[in-house]
Amino acid sequence: MNTMTLTPGQLSLSQLYDIWRHPVQLRLDASAIDGINASVACVNDIVAEGRTAYGINTGFGLLAQTRIADEDLQNLQRSLVLSHAAGVGDPLDDAMVRLIMVLKINSLARGFSGIRLSVIEALIALVNAGVYPLIPAKGSVGASGDLAPLAHLSLTLLGEGKARWQGEWLPAQTALKKAGLEPVALAAKEGLALLNGTQASTAFALRGLFEAQELFASAVVCGALTTEAVLGSRRPFDARIHAARGQQGQIDVARLFRHLLTDTSAIAESHHHCHKVQDPYSLRCQPQVMGACLTQLRQTKEVLLAEANAVSDNPLVFADAGEVISGGNFHAEPVAMAADNLALAIAEIGALSERRIALMMDKHMSQLPPFLVKNGGVNSGFMIAQVTAAALASENKALAHPHSVDSLPTSANQEDHVSMAPAAGRRLWEMAANTRGIIAVEWLAACQGIDLREGLTSSPLLEQARQTLREQVAHYTQDRFFAPDIECATALLAQGALQRLVPDFM
């Protein structure tokens, strides 16, 4: 199991990916402790001096004007967690819960939240023991933070609700006991610090980004395979074309195609003197379209990496000045907009792949047998596989609708503009699954097309991509049950079978 020392505010994208993919043993860097303790001392001073400060000794939301007596402060924090745990929907999987928990720890340990080290260490202990709170997928609008999901996370700290331990759903109290842990009692401000933040929204969008990176790389490989299968030209990938435009994403994608295709191949030599002048856009404009998608991926990475390391609590404790200041860092608009932009890229990656599949079906465009199978009529070949790809591409067009332009006021109009970032991030998962299905069909089709080129071969890397598929899925000599082949190719893509052929592009 990977051991990671967490220096608050310094998580890298590769660390976040590892946290999502694998269980982790966390330890907090000692450099964070003084800042954490100073923020707690500031909160304690405010309570001792009888000063009024939002979230410490007041109600919440529209009830912020209500002053809470000192003897009720501990109960206030517990009540806050219980009342806000109002999510619905299927539970998030362990990987997503783990990522949310680490993001929460990373934010709290920055020392602006007034939460004790012992509570942060209790969260770390949950991660290290593999105790995963039951967090329903729905119920947050992404402002004031992800209240419901983070409340469900916090329930387990209190010994309330349910949690998963070693694959079994248990009452949280039981899960804690089996893991050798104890519930905690929250002090002033700690419940609010746990609940306020964009960690669920950010984790949802990060998963979308991680999947989009795999899809992008896989689509570039399959696009290169299709270029070979239909006797496409390498000329559109000439570096001079892309330098003339100056779009960095486009320049970098053209470089990836040159890397995959190399200068020539047996297939390329077979049509070196053909009379075609230009290829269809789905081949010729791959650097332009995929370059625009790459730009979106890179911009999304910058926004989400900043948010993953951000303090999105409210109010914030500035211990050096002895002040607690209310603001709006919990508003997840940056995450929502980033997720919306990422949705466009995921949709377009799939849409372009589907067009290349359609091109291969047309014997006039591909110079291959109709639907990529011999003895057509008796055999239907890839006819309906392309229809499936079209259905998935169409679904993604609807799912790509922006969520950040939507808002519904909540909390009696105190919270009158919200981000809808959780929904913006969560729909990326379905979009990614759809696009992966499309790319799987293209991989199957392109390899079939190259097979039909009478023993001619492509470049070494593309032959490796074909061999990887052929080790699991046989060439189509006649019709057979098609769905298992799509399922197999999809699983290989999800495992990074094609992504590893592409140099780092982020």
From Swiss-Prot:
Keyword presence, Lyase: yes
Signal sequence annotation: none
Single GO cellular component term: cytoplasm
Single GO term (MF): histidine ammonia-lyase activity
Domain of life the protein comes from: Bacteria
Classification via NCBIfam families: hutH, PRK09367.1
Record protein name field: Histidine ammonia-lyase
Gene from which the chain derives: hutH
